[in-house]
Amino acid sequence: MANVVVVGAQWGDEGKGKITDLLSEKAHVVVRYQGGVNAGHTVVVGGQIFKLHLIPSGILYPDKRCIIASGTVIDPEVLLAEIDQLHQLGISTHNLYIAETAHVTLPYHRVIDVAEEERRGIYRLGTTGRGIGPTYADKAERMGIRVVDLMYPDQLRERLSWAIPYKNVLLEKIYNLPPLDPEPIIEQYLAYAERLRPYVTDAALLLTQAIEERQNILFEGAQGTLLDLDYGTYPYVTSSHPIAGGACVGAGIGPTSIDRVIGVAKAYTTRVGEGPFPTELKDEIGAYLGAAGAEFGTTTGRQRRCGWFDGVIGRYAVRINGLDCLAITKLDVLDGLDEIKVCVAYEYQGREIRHFPSDARVFAQCKPIYETLPGWKCSTKDCRSLEDLPPEAYDYLKFLAQLMQVPIAIVSLGASRDQTIIVEDPIHGPKRALLYPNGRKQVHALMPD
């Protein structure tokens, strides 16, 4: 195989869970490298639905080691509930490992997250309210609680006995909320610690050993490129780094250890929460996409905003992540449409721009410039090869590959594993340098000309 990073090429919810699940079959180790319970993956196997927030999708394979790495933030209550749910479904978690250096979400993080969002009023960010941002803020301020702290009761009690009164000052003085009682929280997290103890390890060392043994490692990102703290639609972003470079810091590996980067994008675009969205559809087509695609968040249940495919942010994701290939998901949601539009550029103050603007104020004023392609009336759900696709669907994929200037390796046509077209092996297929030996020579049906 190789060491492969799977990233979202849009605003998250692209279907990374299914793609990671498919690729996990060839991996020895699957790593979740950033984010927390603000992300959710849905995997369907044999008609059984698995909804995961923290545990890597590879857990469904008993012979794969699954690591929750240092770049994540862990809510013990949610993590233990996931473990219990998997056990109830007959899935073992003997192959789960938790980085001792990952930071821990505490009750005051969740309270502050919700209170701060309410305080922002019309300037709210649309957070999940799960305490992710405040947990990462404590990490940056060097006052966070790490998983390793849970392993030492006296140390945990000492740290929380200082941290909770400090947070109570914020709750009372800034948010006008009642203080939290330290003792129940301390006892609760001591109990969590005992249940988590068998899973806790030096994850970075474990990965180093796997790399030295030339094992195949799959790095699974949460959220998407446009939610990256540095390179997303700031301030409407998450508090971590979902981009491919985030795998190095979050997992504790060097950049030379990464062999390939696979981007996942829907055949249209969705976004949850606040922030600019140039191709958003607020008409009956947007409602159709939302209904046909079951566009409700795994974590919050919030309805996702829907729009046409945005090639501008797509090209940006290719550049920022150095994508080698793409997996296009939910192509079947477009079944039945008379025509399909794709954003190829933006209009801003009377001029055309083809790059993603880093200034949110500029981005908010961008209007999409579309190219219109014919739709198709038949279902694609049962297609298992490119030849099975209606010509219009094939041409649509070809157009996206040309627009993004990166090959499409996987096409997903439903939630189940078997509802997939493997166009080219995304792991063992040719690298970017081999795809374009003479400029942009076409070497595959779904590679750009």
From Swiss-Prot:
Binding site residues for substrate: 298-304
Gene Ontology CC terms, in alphabetical order: cytoplasm
Residues annotated to bind Mg(2+): 13, 40
InterPro entries cross-referenced by the UniProt entry: Adenylosuccin_syn_GTP-bd, Adenylosuccin_syn_Lys_AS, Adenylosuccinate_synth_dom1, Adenylosuccinate_synth_dom2, Adenylosuccinate_synth_dom3, Adenylosuccinate_synthetase, P-loop_NTPase
Residue positions binding GTP: 12-18, 40-42, 304, 330-332, 412-414
Subunit structure of this chain's protein: Homodimer.
Protein name as it appears in the record: Adenylosuccinate synthetase
